[in-house]
């Protein structure tokens, strides 16, 4: 193979790699920026397309959840010292992972269980994916807050809270219209279903705490019996 042919092969490989990179960037822009922004700007129409045209993707929703977990962990280490109110020694990555997915899962099943009583049209997968997309503004708000926290002065600290607060507000805003569109409800019925969802979440949390306490007491009882037997007979 001549030097000219070698050069052509290298250029061909580089071209293919570059095309793959461009394709990946195009997908990232479309799935993680353009469409979520479209939903945020036009929530009714956006979530209607999300449901009817199957534009919402589960892997994108899960990615937003993972990104939020990553940002929560990064906040322990890299938030500016003026803003930071957390103790890095108390960081538990496993707890952060479980917390986000547990919250989204509980809200999903609580909402689904309530809306089945009110003729809701949303499926579990659709509700879960919708909640994941609703994390879009919070993710970018946390990223912006994390970056700006290292440049803010004491007098500007409130700006950090404003950024995070705006992200939470937009998340709730998207979630409200998401529930309306996913279940094809009117305003009153949607508000009623959200109140029912909150009640269902409290019930699930109560049962979860009760179950955890019961398991803890049972394990303690079994351990006590084992200790008594081992001291007497072993």
Predicted regions and their residues:
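Membrane-helix interface segments in multi-pass membrane proteins
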Residues: 72-99, 145-168, 205-234
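Short, non-transmembrane cytosolic segments of multipass membrane proteins
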Residues: 2-30
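Alpha-helical membrane-anchoring segments
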Residues: 14-18, 56-68, 127-134, 188-196
